[in-house]
Amino acid sequence: MIYILFVLFVVVIITLSLWVLSLARKQKKSVLLFEENYDLKAITIADIDRMEDGSGFEMYLYRLLIELGYSGVYKTLGSRDFGADVVFTDREGVRNVIQAKRYSTEYPVGISAVQEVFSCMRYYKAKKAIVITSSHFTESCETLAGINFVKLIDRTDLIHVIEAFRDGDMIEARDIIEAEPRMILESWSEANSNTLHEVRKDYKAEKYVKKVISK
């Protein structure tokens, strides 16, 4: 009986020790991301993938833009950002709003990111909007961004920015960030036509409304 109690005691001690060690490692990792003196050039895409949430990614981008020499760089308050995580002024003197999405590669960014960052432009008096992600974008997200001239920076672009910064090539990093967005433009005939785009109707809703009205 005493032997069994001793074994149980040892198991409990080992379990608690492992839990405390795991917690300490997590706390250390979080502190690393928010300490003002951590080496920004040491951060790689792998470090971004290990971040526990989006706030670490936002802080990284905030510091990166400052290091790249941009002016008017601000990190917004998380709870009331109206769709923008970081704001900065580019080399042309144009204010940009950024929405940062730290997603794992198996989860692409959807259209809500474009909707949110585009809708907050007027609030921040910005002329350009950017969505930056550690993942990729859905096809519908790319389409909506192209129509509204929202710049999309995906994982591949982000890696190029990080590598350029780590190599000390600030101009290349800024050129990637400030490159014109992929635009989806209408032809001249479409732009001057009175024909509206086809709307995908909800026929169930239409049928229901007709039924209600007919009563």
Set out the residue ranges of the language-model regions.
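Mixed-charge (Asp/Glu-Lys/Arg
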Residues: M1-F82, V87-K215
